Amino acid sequence: MTKQLRSIIGILFVGLLMFPAIVKADGGGVSLKGNFQSDALVGQLDSVIGATGYNGPFVSNSYLDLSLASQYVTAGARLELLHCPLPGFEDAFAGGGLPNIYVTGKYKWFEATIGNVYDQFGSGFIFRAYEDRPLGVDNSLRGARFVFTPYKGIRLKALGGMQRKYFNYGMNNAFGFDYSQGAVMGADLELNVSEWSKVMQEGGYNLLFGASYVSKYDPDEVIQPSPLYKLNLPQFVGAGDVRVRFQKGGWNALVEYAYKANDPSADNGYIYKPGQAAMLSLAYSQRGMSFLVQAKRSENMSFRSDRTGSGIGGFINHMPAFSMTHTYALAAMYPYATQYGTPKARGEWAFQAEARYTFKRKTPMGGKYGTSFRLNGTYIRGIKANPLETNITGTLQGTNGYTSPFFGFGDETYYLDVHLEFSKKITKTFSMTALYMFQQYNQAVVEGHGWNAAEEGYWFKGSKTADIANSHIGIVELKYKPSKNIGMRGELQYLFTRQDRGQWVYALYEISLFQQAMIEISDLYNADATKQHYYKVAASYNWGTHRVQLSYGRTRAGYNCSGGVCRYVPASKGLALSYSVSF
């Protein structure tokens, strides 16, 4: 980083820290809000688990968010310091500066934002700009957004800008703020019909129609499947979305459809077939009971600001996951990543259903304190894709790629998850949760490989190549709270599979003191392939809005996932320190 940039960041950092005093002295109708977060690791080499290198002896991700708000205007900025980022964050993350800054003005039915904006149209099929720090996702647009609410029940949004791509220092980019080479623009209209009907309001009905359009501009470039010809690439690619949501009492129904024009890219192998996505969701909820059923079909819906992009950065859209995000360690060992459309997986059919029921207290099943059950099932399968004839180079580049009947299912299961969870409070101080899960996980599709039994070092020698890992998982969690100031929690988990690395066992013990301090000891053990322990000791303390955590131990290599988006995180070992504060 240049000396000039260090000086500018230092001045801005000091100036931002002085804002509280300035606001307090002003005494006007201006308020300051902010938060600071820093995650650091002093890494140690451990070749046994694959922790063979870090970005430096001390690696950290630090963020400072500040916003000043008055009655009509809000201004904010975020300082990021990621010069030596944590394991799992690629080189594009390395850097520091103020990549996020904005000013928003509101008056009556109009709102305008200049700077970096985050937003989402509908379910995100064609547009979602958001931040997820643990995943390393920040695809905000630097540009402008306008929101109009001219009449009750009507909201119109229009926005445009260049998409963020983290940091990239160079001769022509001294500040390191890197953005897409093209631009993204779009509009979203929502009509809440219930706001116009007194009958619907009195009956408790809510009916909403939505429509969106997004277009990206990506400058032309030379991509040649062979020396004989180059691809004629569209510089403007449009996508549209329509949706209807209906609510009545505990009922909630959603139907949504999106269409994307032909968008040849590195993701889809530079084919010209349009993309589409359709979703149906029905849910019901009342006290003590709820259920949810969902179905989604999507194909060729990778939509990036740069057609040659890769990894999890640069997406304009977000395809919502139909697999549950598990919090237990072994249940989350094989997380599913949504398939946007690649030559290996052109799309997916996804189904999810869930039912919850709580037996009332003082009933045969409920007992003295009540009993809760939750049954959840997810099934995701590929779409049927019939390849077209290849071009003169023997590939599908420059063609429509394939045909696919809408209701056609492919030959491969991508993911299956069925689990039953039981929760019961046994006494005033003691409660338990038990869970059983059966899971099928297609490693060849999700991770790009299957584990080959013929390779040296794998525990199941002699068996066939395993693209799908079949797992049986059992979990028991116990909670004991003998007093107001003391609480204890323990977990015992077991995962059985004959594929991948074989069986795993996980145990955790946690004690909380005075609702402020917590000490945790855990160990993850692989009983077959590696026979390695991944131990960890952690302590945390909360004081007001301050939180600090210190831990030491091993972390296995694996995938960190949220909402169907996954990032590979390599193995690590060392002393980790996290601190956060809000004000």
Regions found by a protein language model. Give the residues of each.
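Bacterial N-terminal signal peptides that target proteins for export
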Residues: 2-9
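Bacterial N-terminal signal peptides
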Residues: 10-20
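Beta-barrel outer-membrane channel/assembly domains of diderm bacteria
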Residues: 23-119, 125-127, 140-160, 180-198, ...
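Exposed, low-structure sequence patches enriched in small/polar residues
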Residues: 37, 59, 197-204, 209-213, ...
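Short acidic/His/Gly/Ser-rich catalytic and metal-binding motifs that mark active-site loops
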Residues: 43, 121-124, 166-167, 219-222, ...
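A short secondary-structure junction signal
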Residues: 125-126, 168-172, 221-225, 256
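Short helix/strand-bridging catalytic loops that position acidic/His residues to coordinate divalent metals
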Residues: 128-132, 172-174, 267-270, 277
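Flexible, glycine/proline-enriched loop segments at strand-loop-helix junctions
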Residues: 131-134, 171-179, 230-231
